[in-house]
């Protein structure tokens, strides 16, 4: 096959073999040729500052030499075994040491898979079926997760709205939807429904911050109504702090999911909880009826584990998170100055380590208020 060099030719080839022309729903309209540090280059050689960082995994930048060295050291020893391996065990130990709610973990390949198993685990542990999630919260591509992620029409809470074709109608009956940052709505739903297994939440929902006391309130309500609290830390884990949102906000869930950074740029995710909850993965303890089957071809593979271990080691070094926050503050200030100078109304929402710009004058407290953003900008 001819070695094509121009970006337009590569885009045409992509459109021929991929539905909608890309790997997923997100298509930036460029073809990335390589990355180094905080920059990526397209097939035409154009240099971009990469604020996407692979949607989160590349927090250290592209091609970090220590991560490359760790991967190259593991490669000749084996790439995957479908069995326990030393690197996977070491990574699990590092996660248990770092993340407050984790006494034990299970590895999977993607964050969406981790969230799917977290929901299933909550149901197995409690014997209940319903899940409360927040409108606009992203938890992967499972049927439950694709409820009220990005609804185009507003319906009355707590009605769930599917965001994708192919989801059986019965799934919505097992989901309750609440607005983010609304403890009163959550308490009302808990009081009116005795079949709720868990509340699943992003501690920082996309880039909408939790209002002061909201996460603490969720924890208290879950304790009062004997409902499990799941933190989806696929994005926030090892990013807001080394111990993730749990360390940063001082709130410990019952179950959490992790991904992105823990794989160091390779496919790897995990879910973790107390040993009491995680025992449902052990048939010898809970028996067949309460056992949760879970396995995956590449789960815990040593290449991803080696990359993740080295990434976590680097992040744990003194000054890593203070530098990350200083950089984030500087970027926020520069963005605000530029937009204010142009007379453009805006809000910078999120955390110093993870943020975005909304072109609106009102506060962003939940999905519906964020929708007031001007998409044309």
Show the residue positions of the predicted features.
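Conserved N-terminal phosphate-binding loop of PLP-dependent enzymes in the Aspartate aminotransferase
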Residues: 1-377
